[in-house]
């Protein structure tokens, strides 16, 4: 199932941008546990959150989401 795939690169991008899960959770107004699940790809952020994340981290959606993994499903 999709939850087991690495569909997003959020963890990698946070490291590249020198930001923490806690910082992102505060900026988005969601729990640190939720962000942690997104970072480990055990769940995926909804599209609205993905768009907010791209703005906060100054990245493009194509850099955050691994669309090639979606094609394999």
Task: Give residue spans per PLM region.
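Recognition helix of helix-turn-helix/homeodomain-like DNA-binding domains
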Residues: 30-44
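DNA major-groove recognition helix of helix-turn-helix
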Residues: 39, 57, 68
